C-alpha cells in the first residue's frame, strides 16, 4: 500500500467535552445545645441552612471540593419580643470520580438546600436534620487532528467552512476582602446579626497580555436586632457597597479573547466591634471562574474520493463552539404573604431566594424556557409587637428566544440572581412582594457535522476505466447533489459543472446531465 503521492494538510481543532455531569447529596445533622448566655427557646421563627463551595481541585482522576454549610436559627423566648439568632458552620469534603482527561478543565459546582427540619427538643436543645445536593459540571478541551486539504492521486475534496475555538483558557481564583464598615449615625447599635446577604454587580472585565482584570461592586445587606432609644425591641437593615478590583494571571490571554466571568459569593461574615463605635468588620469571600475563548475559522474536509484509486477515510463527529452570545435579560415575580397571627404592624426586612432553576428547549416556541421557584420572605411584627416570619413560594418561567438563522446545535448556560425585592402592605394582614431577577450567562452555538481525521489512497486498488466513452448521460431529479453524482462516476465536480454550464452544486430542475469521464 503506497500513499507517497498523497499529501495532506492538517489542523488541530479543539472541541469542548463534558467530563462530568453529576450530583451528590450530603446529609446535614446537628444536635444543637444553646450556650449558657443565650435565652431559652420558646418558638422557632425560621431555620435555614446555606451551603457554599469554598475551594475545589482536580488530582488523580478525582474532583475534590470543600463545602461550608451555615446553619442559622431565628427564635424568640417566652414573654420576650427580641429576635434571637444562633448559628453554626459545618465543613465537609466531597469528591467525584472523573471519566477521562481533558485540557483546561472548567469546574462549575452548584450547591442547594434540599430540605431542613428543626425540632425543639427542649428549651435549650434543637435537633436539626437536612440535606444538601451539589451538582458538578466539568468540561474540558480535546484537540483532534482534522484534514483541511489534500493533493495528488486524483483526490477530490468536499469542504466546509467552520468557526472553532482556536484557544480556550480557564482560570479560577478565591478572593478574600476584609473591610471595616460603619453604621449610619441614625442607626441603633447592633445587638445580634440576624441575616447577611451579598450580591455581586460586575462593572468591567478587561483582558491584557497574560492577565484578566475584573472590577465590580459587592452589595452587602445586613439585618440585625437592636433596641430603640425608648427601650423597644426592633430590627434594622443596613446596606454597604464594597468595590473590588482583582488581577488574575492567565497565560496566553489578550484582548482578542472573549471571556465568560462569573463571580460567586462564598461567605460573608460581619462582626461588630465591642467598643460601641458602630464599626463592623466584614470578611467577604468571592470565587471567580473564567472561561476565555479565541475563535478562528478554517475550511475542513467533510468528504473525499479519488478519481484514480479506492480511498479509505477515518471520520469523527464534530461539535465546535462557533459562537457565544451573552445573555442580558430580566424577569419579575410577585407573591402575596398573609399573616394568620393578627395584623402586620411593621416589616423589618423582605428578601427573595431562587431555587430549582432549570432550562429546556421548546422547539415549537423556538426558545429556551428558564424555570424555577422564588421563595419570598419577610420578618416583621404584629400589632402587639410579637416577631413574625412569613414565606411563600412562587414558580416562574421565562423565555429566551433563539436567534434566527442559527446553523447548528444551541445550548444555554444561564446565570440568575435576585436583583431587588420590594414590598407593600396591601391590607392589615397581607403583604405583596415583587422580586426582580437578573438573567445573565451565555448561549452557545455549536457547529455539528462529520469531519475527516485521516485519509488514505489505496494505490494498489485502481479504479476501472472504460476508454471507449468520454461522456455518460445521467438523468437527475431536482435538488440532487452534484457531489454525490461526481463521486458515483469517479469524476470531478468541476468537470461536470463546466460541461453542463452550471454554477450551483445542486440540480435546479429535473433533467439530463452530461458526465465527463476521467479516463
Give the predicted meaning of each segment.
Residues 2-468:
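Membrane-lipid interaction segments
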Residues 376, 480, 485, 502:
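Conserved structured catalytic cores and adjacent interaction surfaces
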Residues 453-477, 510-519:
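Surface-exposed, interaction-prone regions with an acidic/low-complexity signature
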Residues 476, 482-488, 493-497:
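Short alpha-helical segments in extracytoplasmic peptidoglycan/chitin-binding modules
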Residues 492-519:
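Extracellular LysM carbohydrate-binding repeats and other cell-envelope/extracellular binding modules
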Amino acid at each position: 500500500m503506497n500513499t507517497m503521492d498523497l499529501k495532506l494538510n492538517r489542523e488541530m481543532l479543539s472541541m469542548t467535552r463534558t467530563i462530568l455531569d453529576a450530583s451528590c447529596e450530603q446529609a446535614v445533622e446537628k444536635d444543637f445545645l444553646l450556650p449558657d448566655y443565650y435565652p431559652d427557646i420558646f418558638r422557632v421563627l425560621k431555620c435555614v441552612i446555606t451551603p457554599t463551595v469554598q475551594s475545589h481541585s482536580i488530582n488523580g482522576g478525582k474532583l475534590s471540593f470543600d463545602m461550608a454549610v451555615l446553619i442559622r436559627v431565628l427564635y424568640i423566648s417566652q414573654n420576650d419580643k427580641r429576635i434571637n439568632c444562633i448559628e453554626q458552620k459545618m465543613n465537609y469534603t466531597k469528591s467525584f470520580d472523573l471519566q477521562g482527561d481533558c485540557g483546561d478543565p472548567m469546574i462549575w459546582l452548584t450547591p442547594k438546600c434540599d430540605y431542613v427540619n428543626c425540632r425543639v427538643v427542649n428549651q435549650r436543645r434543637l435537633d436539626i436534620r437536612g440535606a444538601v445536593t451539589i451538582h458538578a459540571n466539568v468540561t474540558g478541551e480535546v484537540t483532534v487532528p482534522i484534514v483541511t486539504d489534500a493533493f495528488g492521486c486524483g483526490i477530490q475534496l468536499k469542504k466546509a467552512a467552520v468557526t472553532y475555538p482556536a484557544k480556550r483558557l480557564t482560570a479560577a481564583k478565591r478572593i478574600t476582602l476584609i473591610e471595616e464598615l460603619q453604621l449610619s449615625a441614625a442607626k441603633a447599635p447592633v445587638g445580634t446579626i440576624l441575616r447577611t446577604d451579598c450580591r455581586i454587580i460586575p462593572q468591567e472585565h478587561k483582558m491584557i497580555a497574560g492577565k484578566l482584570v475584573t472590577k465590580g461592586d459587592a452589595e452587602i445587606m445586613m439585618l440585625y436586632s437592636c433596641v430603640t432609644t425608648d427601650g423597644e425591641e426592633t430590627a434594622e437593615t443596613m446596606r454597604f457597597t464594597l468595590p473590588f478590583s482583582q488581577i488574575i494571571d492567565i497565560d496566553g490571554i489578550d484582548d482578542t479573547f472573549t471571556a465568560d466571568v462569573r463571580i460567586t459569593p462564598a461567605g460573608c461574615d460581619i462582626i461588630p466591634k465591642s467598643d460601641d463605635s458602630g464599626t463592623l468588620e466584614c470578611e467577604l469571600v468571592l470565587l471567580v471562574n473564567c472561561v476565555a475563548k479565541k475563535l478562528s475559522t478554517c475550511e475542513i474536509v467533510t468528504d473525499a474520493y479519488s478519481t484514480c484509486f479506492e480511498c479509505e477515510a477515518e471520520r469523527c463527529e464534530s461539535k465546535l463552539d462557533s459562537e457565544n452570545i451573552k445573555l442580558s435579560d430580566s424577569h419579575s415575580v410577585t407573591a402575596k404573604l398573609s399573616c394568620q397571627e393578627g395584623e402586620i404592624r411593621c416589616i423589618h426586612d423582605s428578601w427573595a431566594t431562587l431555587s430549582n432553576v432549570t432550562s429546556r428547549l421548546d422547539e415549537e416556541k423556538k426558545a429556551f424556557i428558564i424555570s424555577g421557584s422564588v421563595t419570598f420572605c419577610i420578618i416583621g411584627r404584629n400589632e402587639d409587637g410579637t416577631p413574625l416570619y412569613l414565606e411563600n413560594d412562587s414558580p416562574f418561567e421565562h423565555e429566551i428566544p433563539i436567534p434566527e438563522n442559527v446553523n447548528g446545535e444551541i445550548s444555554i448556560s444561564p446565570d440568575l440572581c435576585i436583583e431587588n425585592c420590594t414590598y407593600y402592605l396591601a391590607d392589615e394582614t397581607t403583604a405583596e412582594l415583587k422580586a426582580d431577577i437578573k438573567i445573565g450567562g451565555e448561549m452557545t452555538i455549536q457547529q455539528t457535522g462529520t469531519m475527516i481525521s485521516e485519509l488514505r489512497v489505496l494505490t494498489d486498488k485502481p479504479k476501472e476505466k472504460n476508454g471507449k466513452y468520454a461522456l455518460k448521460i445521467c438523468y437527475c431529479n431536482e435538488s440532487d447533489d452534484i457531489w454525490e453524482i461526481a463521486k458515483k462516476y469517479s469524476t470531478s465536480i468541476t468537470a461536470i459543472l463546466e460541461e453542463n454550464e452550471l454554477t450551483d452544486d445542486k440540480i435546479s430542475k429535473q433533467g439530463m446531465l452530461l458526465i465527463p469521464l476521467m479516463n
